[in-house]
Amino acid sequence: MKKYKIFVACDTSNINIVRKIIKDTKNKKLEIIPKFGLQFFYSKNGRKFLEKFKKHFFLDLKINDISTTARYAIKSIKDLKNCRYITIHANGGLNMMKAIKKETKKTNKKIKVLGVTVLTSLNNKSLKQTGHTKNINQIVLKQAILIKKSGCDGIVCSAQEAKIIKKKYKSLFVLTPGIRLPGDKKDDQSRVVTPFDALIKTKVDAIVMGRSLTKNNIKKNVQRLIDHIY
């Protein structure tokens, strides 16, 4: 039986809640890896916690800046030995992505650099409001070309775009956020699919799950996920 890769979003600044999420998502059927974003990383003790964290984790910083600043941001996490994935914004451009990938090879070769395309909280209307004239599919495909060209290891996109990306760029690690178990609320997400749709139908390499796993009873939610997939 295939062991699917799930990144669980530890979207909190409370270390005790993080410990509970990690403890309660532990199981033998799925590979569940904690994902830490801006809220935890910027919190008072978040970074210190990650310095001492003994297991592999995903650092979701979505870096987006000039090449030099972005490169030094990677250099500054050299001490986070168990970081295995980090996100950067494709909007930062080809030179920034190249600089980050180059620095990552020096800092920690084990880190996979993932390029974030259009956030799953956005839709075509949202993009139009910010001045974009192309639709989501067109933008993501354009960004995918740059991500591949930059040497980055993977791409973050919704399941809708992932179908095309998987066919066109087979070597890219495809990660899909915007995942909800059947019946769960969309909350602030716009482009949402179920774990089954993403992992089984679209065959993405991994998914990100937040509230569908971490809200209310975590252990029960993990079992719901297992029953849903298998």
Question: Which residues does each predicted region cover?
Answer:
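Acidic (Asp/Glu)-rich catalytic clusters
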Residues: 22-29, 47-54, 76-80, 101-108, ...
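Conserved anion-binding
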Residues: 2-3, 69-154, 158-162, 166, ...
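Active-site-proximal loop/turn and secondary-structure-junction residues that shape catalytic pockets
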Residues: 12-14, 38-42, 63-65, 90-94, ...
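Conserved alpha/beta-domain cores
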Residues: 10-53, 61, 67-70, 159, ...
